[in-house]
Amino acid sequence: MLEVSGLVKRFGGFTAVNNVSFKVGLGEILGLIGPNGSGKSTIFNLLSGTLAPTAGSIRFHGREIAGRPPHQIINQGIGRTFQIPRPFRRLSLFDNVALAGYYGQGRHSHVRAYEAAERALELVGLPVDRDAPVTGLGAAGLKKLELAKALATGPSLLLADESLGGLDEAEMVQAAEMLRRIRTQLGLTIIWVEHILGVLMRVVDRVMVLDHGEKISEGLPAEVAADPRVIEVYLGTEADAVQAAARR
C-alpha cells in the first residue's frame, strides 16, 4: 500500500530524516517509535504533505505523492490525527467533523460530509447530536474528536499521532482498543506514532524505530524489543517496558 524509499529531509544544515525506507502492507498497524527529536513527526509531516522531502520517494497505491499539498494527500486517502487537538470551539462537535468530511476524498457535498460525520462520530463513541458543544470535552473526548475528524475524510491509511497523550491508564487501553477495532471494521491501514510503548507494543503488527533521523530497527515487536540498538536508545526503564510489552 505505502512504499517509502530513501526519504531525506533537511532544514538548512540539519538533517531531520536521513535515507529512511519502509513499506506498510494493507490492513497493517505499524508502530513508529523513537526518542524525542528522532524524526517521527517529520516523517508524518512528509507523508501528509505538510512538508516536501529534500530527496526520496513516497508511493501510495503505486502513485508518487511526495511533495503534494495536504488537500491532495487527503483526497488520495491518507488521513491524519494530531498530537495536540485544536478543534474549532465555536462549532459543534458535529460541524467540526463534518468540515473534515467535506474535504475528504473530493466529496465537496454537504450531504455526503454529514453522512461521513455521523459514521465517524458513531465509530469513536461521541454524540451525533448536531448541537453538542466541543467545550467541556476532556482529554479522552478531544482525542476521540481528533480521530473522528480523520476518519470522516474517508482514509484507507490513517496516520495516528500520539493518540494516548494526556490519557489515564484506563483511557489509554480504551483508545488503543478503539484503533484496533476501527482497523478491523473499516479495513484501515495505520501508522501509529506513540511514546506509551507498553500499550503500543501490544497492538501493532510491526514496529519501526528511529534515532537521530535514521531507521535503526524494524520488525515484529518481540524482535525489535530484543535489538541491542533499541535497548541502547531506550536505556533503563523504557527498554524494560518495551521488552515486557512485547512478551505479552
Residue ranges and their predicted role:
Residues 1-248:
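Glycine-rich phosphate-binding loops of nucleotide-dependent enzymes
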